[in-house]
């Protein structure tokens, strides 16, 4: 993603009623892994890398510079509010984001492609 909006993109799509959660998972997880031939990614399956994002639906929250979990520290979505929120993120099974805190000590693994 070229802009720092990935964490809010699913919120936007569900808020506007554009896609169901199942369709968002298909478009943001399954399809990229299939299209680009990324090995062992994009699905929750035995033997696959555990790249997961846990989201919750609840209280409204507003995007601002204090709660943007991005090194760039800005977002074109500042000032917008959402009910969906990323609570935890796992990369290769390692917890790298939890309740607003980023673990920047973990380095992911190189992607492998099946061409």
Locate the predicted segments by residue.
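Active-site microenvironment of metallo-dependent hydrolases
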Residues: 2-115
């Amino acid at each position: 993603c070229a802009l720092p909006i990935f964490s809010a993109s699913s919120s936007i799509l569900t808020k506007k009623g554009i896609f169901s959660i199942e369709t968002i998972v298909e478009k943001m997880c399954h399809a990229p892994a299939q299209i680009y031939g990324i090995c062992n990614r994009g699905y929750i399956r035995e033997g696959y890398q555990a790249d997961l994002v846990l989201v919750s639906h609840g209280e409204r929250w507003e995007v601002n510079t204090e709660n943007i979990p991005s090194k760039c520290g800005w977002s074109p979505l500042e000032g917008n509010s959402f009910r969906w929120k990323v609570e935890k993120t796992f990369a290769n099974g390692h917890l790298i984001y939890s309740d607003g805190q980023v673990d920047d000590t973990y380095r992911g693994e190189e992607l492998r492609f099946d061409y």
